[in-house]
Amino acid sequence: MQIYLAVTPAEAQEASRFRCSLAHVAYCIGPDSTLLRQNLLLQTRGGLLSVTDRGAPFIASPERLSAAALRECGRRSYGGVLLDFEQPPAPDRLAFAETLARRLSPRPVYVPESYAAASGAIPLICTAISGGNFVQRLQEAAAGRDRAGGLALDVQRLRMDFTLPAQSGEGRPLSGRELQDLL
């Protein structure tokens, strides 16, 4: 099982002591389908390239953006890409995910579950659920996939207090001390 720890450039050096692969949360989509990078250490190598679409413009050229991501993967020896898309699925983002997955293959391209329709990409299934059966949830997510190993888990460490009934599935965040007091 491969585990990636998502880190910003400021967290990368400290996180490297955990001896696991890192997903470098340092990239975003810029104007004219460019790939923009935050300040990374020169020696940053391996792990995943993580791209956000927060505040990103329309992707006019999925090919151009894919080529930029491919070059960066080669330069930094990244083993794949995590598309940390926050926007709802849109044709330009789906086209980028599919183009990148095709060009980067056999290296993985991970996408949010809402982008699971992107051919060749691996959907991330969020493990932070507030009810139901987790095994059933995974079985349902896997049912639509065409190959084994076609899912990845997005594990988030959360501490929340839920007032029942929890209609929204969102609870009130708890500090470590508040959780201990409840236990």
Region annotations inferred by a language model:
Residues 1-183:
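Secreted glycan hydrolases and related glycan-binding modules that recognize and/or cleave
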